[in-house]
Amino acid sequence: MVEPLLSGIILGLIPVTLSGLLVAAYLQYQRGNQLGL
């Protein structure tokens, strides 16, 4: 009964983590453009 719960949590965390990394990279890129780097 625990394995489906763990797999569901992992499957839910993967897209959240990926989107978080994409947002962080995008904000860093925008900040770099504003500074003229």
From Swiss-Prot:
An annotated GO cellular component: chloroplast thylakoid membrane
Subcellular location: Plastid, Chloroplast thylakoid membrane
Any one Gene Ontology BP term: cytochrome complex assembly
SUPFAM superfamilies: PetG subunit of the cytochrome b6f complex (SSF103446)
Gene Ontology terms, MF aspect: electron transporter, transferring electrons within cytochrome b6/f complex of photosystem II activity
Membrane topology annotation: Single-pass membrane protein
Pfam families named in the record: PetG (PF02529)
InterPro entries: Cyt_6/f_cplx_su5, Cyt_6/f_cplx_su5_sf
Keyword vocabulary terms for this entry: Chloroplast, Electron transport, Membrane, Photosynthesis, Plastid, Thylakoid, Transmembrane, Transmembrane helix, Transport
Family note: Belongs to the PetG family.
Protein's UniProt name: Cytochrome b6-f complex subunit 5
Organism listed in the record: Porphyra purpurea (Red seaweed)
Taxonomic lineage from the root: Eukaryota, Rhodophyta, Bangiophyceae, Bangiales, Bangiaceae
